[in-house]
Amino acid sequence: MLAYVFWHWKQVEITTKDYESRQRAFHAALGAAPPSGFLGSFSVSLSYAPWAAGGGDAYEDWYLVQDFSALGLLNEAAVSASRAAPHDAAAVVAAGGAGGLYRLQHGAVVRQPQHAYWFGKPEGMQYRDLFAQLAPVVDQVQGAVWMRQMVLGPAREFCVHAGAPVSGLAEFNALVIPLRQAWPALASKGMEPR
């Protein structure tokens, strides 16, 4: 499973209520007419991510797809047909944005994460050792490990999503970001939230 992760933030003069309403309308339109391979979407609001709004208030959308082919279909579908007007209405009030591509490496999707831990692989550590060390820590909180693909995106290489605080990540010097559910899985297609 892949996730297109899109960070975005509102224009100063736009109210949070209006901005989130437009975003919800787009997610709903995408869910009502999903492209092939689209598994669902969710979004959280956050602060302190240096790659989003300079660390200010921002949103982080997760668009889940089966594979790279489905990612291409999502790219086309997001701005066409019944999704075009809601997409454009949401985009016109955004002050900026950045995107990244992540693959689910371990665990299951956490549809309503409360905590995100962003980090890079420690120097000298092999990937197999990193995954072996992360697995029991992440399993304990029923979390998910996402790994950036093809160095696409401004954020760090790994993200651990969890519904509860995660201990045992000190070695990774993770940037810990508290999350707030901005809108639930409006575009869900059979994936149960954790």
Mark where each language-model region is:
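Macromolecular interaction modules
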Residues: 1-194
